[in-house]
């Protein structure tokens, strides 16, 4: 390597990458890169939880206490500074011209005799003016890049916060659900224990009565044993006289002998079926409290008649005189409830009974209510329905609804909505002790959701049965 190349390489190695000047009080982080002490301490930095700061060049974390001034390097810089500033390291002439090809400030000798010979050379003043004009453009490019990365960092920060919030809510939900399970199982344990204690008390009382009776009888037998021994010791005449009396008395006592005591204790059998029933009951106990919904007549299609209690709705052949509200369904025989939800868990039940055609579920605030409805999750509809009284369907993204396998004919449908879990589940809740899952939609919900009811066309009376929101009287809650 020639001396000029060596000097240029040394100058590069002795230059701070932050201020582009020769090192002043050079320090070297643990990663091995070197900076001016003032440049490094003044650089933007983000400390981690251990107090370490990232290297501006490679982002490797470094502990502040490891930063010591490199005295050897500092002395080398001082020696290098003996070359006059603004002079060529090779020829010691002033740096007076600029090589546009190599983008380098050089001296006149370099331009005429050195490696820059034949290149496009301009004066330093011309280069200064030219590059000065280009600087704003570079600043714009830098600003755009910085803003873009700042937006990316903001998005990442928001995603980190969302992840932390999601995990926090998940942990809270897990804790809440498991606490509810523990509470329910504790109540169930106490109930079964009390039932066992009652059975034990009843059986013990009965057995003690039986034992007392048996004790009295045993006393009579022991007494007769003594009498028989006394008769045995008598002379002939006295023996015969007493024996007949004693024998008759003994036969009477033996004839009145109480049957042996036996008592069956009736306790719950801890079988697989029992466990299954407990889990079913616990599942129902863990569901949110039943929502007390009411139909919203302002959203009902013209043929629908909402009963005065707000809990029943049916389809009539006659159109009602109603105003054309923006949120009213105009073609499909549908309506929503007055209540709507934006968060949390919710559960409500609808009596369909023997109605042969219906659809239930939730719709988004932005779902279309005019004209023909295209019921699918992508259009803001999460529904299941029944047709012909026997075909049950889930309105998925498929071209045709998904046919569900349903046992029997559900008379009451339970609908469970969880914003945090992104779930809409449908249950056959006809039997409270035997709730059966029909179908579940999994979705990431945003915005407001409305409980939805499609009464369907009355079909000349064949489908005139009403839909009813189920909510028991207060004394049954």
UniProtKB/Swiss-Prot annotation:
EC number annotated for this UniProt entry: 2.3.2.27
GO molecular function terms listed in the Swiss-Prot or TrEMBL record: phosphatidylserine binding; transferase activity; zinc ion binding
Coiled coil: 135-232
Gene Ontology terms describing biological process: exocytosis; muscle organ development; muscle system process; plasma membrane repair; protein homooligomerization
Any one annotated GO CC term: cytoplasmic vesicle membrane
Chain sites annotated for binding Zn(2+) 2: 29, 31, 53, 56
Subcellular location: Cell membrane, Sarcolemma; Cytoplasmic vesicle membrane
Positions that bind Zn(2+) 1: 14, 17, 34, 37
Record field: catalytic activity: S-ubiquitinyl-[E2 ubiquitin-conjugating enzyme]-L-cysteine + [acceptor protein]-L-lysine = [E2 ubiquitin-conjugating enzyme]-L-cysteine + N(6)-ubiquitinyl-[acceptor protein]-L-lysine
Protein name as catalogued: Tripartite motif-containing protein 72
Lineage: Eukaryota, Metazoa, Chordata, Craniata, Vertebrata
Gene: trim72
């Amino acid at each position: 390597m020639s001396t000029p190349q060596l000097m240029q390489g040394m100058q590069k190695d002795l230059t701070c990458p932050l201020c582009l000047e020769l090192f002043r009080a050079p320090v070297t982080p643990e990663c091995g890169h070197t900076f001016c002490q003032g440049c490094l301490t003044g650089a933007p930095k983000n400390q981690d939880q251990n107090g370490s700061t990232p290297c501006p060049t490679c982002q490797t974390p470094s502990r502040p206490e490891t930063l010591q001034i490199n005295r050897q390097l500092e002395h080398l810089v001082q020696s290098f500074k003996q070359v006059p500033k603004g002079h060529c390291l090779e020829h010691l002439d002033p740096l007076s011209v600029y090589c546009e090809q190599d983008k380098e400030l050089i001296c006149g000798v370099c331009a005429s005799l050195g490696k820059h010979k034949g290149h496009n050379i301009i004066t330093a003043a011309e280069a200064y003016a030219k590059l000065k004009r280009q600087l704003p453009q570079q600043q714009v490019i830098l600003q755009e890049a910085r803003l873009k990365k700042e937006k990316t960092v903001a998005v990442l920060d928001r995603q980190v916060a969302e992840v932390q919030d999601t995990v926090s809510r998940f942990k809270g939900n897990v804790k809440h659900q498991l606490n509810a399970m523990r509470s329910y199982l504790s109540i169930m344990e106490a109930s079964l224990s009390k039932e066992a204690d009652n059975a034990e008390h009843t059986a013990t009382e009965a057995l003690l009565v039986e034992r007392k009776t048996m004790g009295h009888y045993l006393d009579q037998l022991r007494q007769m044993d003594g009498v028989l021994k006394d008769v045995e010791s008598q002379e002939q005449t006295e023996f015969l006289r007493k024996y007949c009396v004693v024998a008759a008395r003994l036969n009477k006592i033996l004839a009145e002998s109480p049957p042996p005591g036996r008592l069956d204790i009736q306790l719950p059998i801890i079988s697989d079926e029992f466990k299954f029933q407990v889990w079913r009951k616990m599942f129902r106990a863990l569901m949110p409290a039943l929502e007390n919904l009411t139909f919203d007549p302002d959203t009902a299609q013209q043929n629908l008649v909402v009963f005065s209690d707000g809990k029943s709705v049916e389809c009539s052949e006659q159109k009602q005189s109603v105003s054309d509200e923006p949120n009213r369904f105009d073609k499909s025989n549908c309506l929503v409830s007055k209540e709507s939800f934006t968060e949390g868990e919710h559960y409500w039940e609808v009596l369909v009974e023997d109605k042969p055609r219906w659809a239930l579920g939730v719709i988004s605030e932005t779902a279309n209510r005019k004209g023909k409805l295209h019921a699918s999750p992508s259009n803001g509809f999460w529904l299941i329905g029944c047709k012909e009284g026997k075909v049950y369907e889930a309105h998925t993204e498929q071209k045709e609804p998904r046919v569900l396998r349903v046992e029997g004919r559900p008379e009451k449908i339970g609908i469970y909505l969880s914003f945090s879990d992104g779930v809409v589940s449908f249950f056959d809740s006809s039997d409270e002790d035997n709730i059966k899952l029909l179908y579940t939609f999994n979705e990431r919900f945003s915005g407001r959701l409305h409980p939805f009811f499609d009464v369907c066309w009355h079909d000349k009376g064949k489908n005139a049965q009403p839909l009813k929101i189920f909510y028991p009287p207060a004394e049954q809650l």
